[in-house]
Amino acid sequence: GEWEQLSKVTESLANILKTGKFPGLEVGDLDLYKAFAWRFWFLSSPIMGRIGVVMPRSALAAAGSAKFRRELMNEAEGLDIVTLQNTGKWVFDMEPRYTIALLGISRSAGEPKGISLKGPFTSMASFLEGKEIDAHRFSVDEVLNLNESASLPLLPEPYSAEVLLQLRKAPWLSLDEPDSWRARADSELHATAQKPLMDFSGTCPDGFWKV
């Protein structure tokens, strides 16, 4: 049927992508944007290259893109990021809860070094106003020391950068030291990763929960 055919196409695409040079692709869901992100980077000139690209915000935060982010931060001269919340579908005609990232990447010497973050903007008016405000420019070391995965936060207000730098003085939540309490983050039940725990039959066996 149509579902079986789609499954075969998806599986074939996944197998093709796994043969490519896309570090981190195996972590988490096999999303196409991870492969495209690396292709943009590999195709740009390491001397005078510039990249302007629209990506899902997960490219800035998900574990599967951590190697890509570290590569950008360590090798790019400048990285400017603007995030857009698709409230009311003002950016794209798609899911309004999505956050989109606009990345400006420069590999040219002489460009402003570091990483700037603006947004998330929830409307055209807030975007036009906010893009004129000078954003704090983080050094690469400041960002890499925020967390283990080089994830980039959302900074809803201009002063949020100062708050973030203050929070940075505290240990990571993942700190694991003897004789000290430890916080461990965990994700929700995942339809892909926890699929073996789910029963898709029509009846609900004893001891199971209907979802």
Briefly describe each language-model feature range:
Residues 1-23, 43, 47, 75, ...:
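Polynucleotide-recognition surfaces of large bacterial nucleic-acid defense/processing enzymes
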Residues 25-37, 113:
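Phosphate/oxyanion-binding active-site loops and adjacent basic polyanion-contact surfaces
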Residues 36-39, 67-72:
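Structural preference for long, well-ordered alpha-helical segments in enzyme cores
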Residues 54-55, 84:
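Short His-Asn-centered micro-motif
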Residues 55-60, 89:
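Conserved short loop/turn motifs at secondary-structure junctions
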Residues 57-59, 70-78:
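Active/binding-pocket-proximal capping segment
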Residues 62-68, 92-94:
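A short acidic (Asp/Glu
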